[in-house]
Amino acid sequence: MKMRSFQTRAFDIKDQNKVMRVVVAALQDLGFIIERANGPMGLVTAGKFGPNGNGFVEVTVVVRAKGKEQTEVRVNALFNTKPVEDPKAYQNFFIAVERSLFVTQG
């Protein structure tokens, strides 16, 4: 449960498609290559090589409506098939998402 708390964030935006576009842009800004993006399912998968080319980082992001006024984003990250448990990795992702949302709203 603790890990889920830093993997999930709700945004006060009801436009799920907009949040999907922002998630894709944020991942690309962080150096990820988008492998799959399925808008109707709210699913994005991406990957990139780890620091100094060591290992591989895979992320799966799920975007879904939360009530009538919010959209929830949940990200799961794996490094060489092991779950990433460092909250900072998830914080960096959500900072990039928030930055992109701010730019698109401004």
Could you describe each region identified by the protein language model?
Residues M1-G106:
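Ser/Thr-rich, low-complexity intrinsically disordered terminal regions
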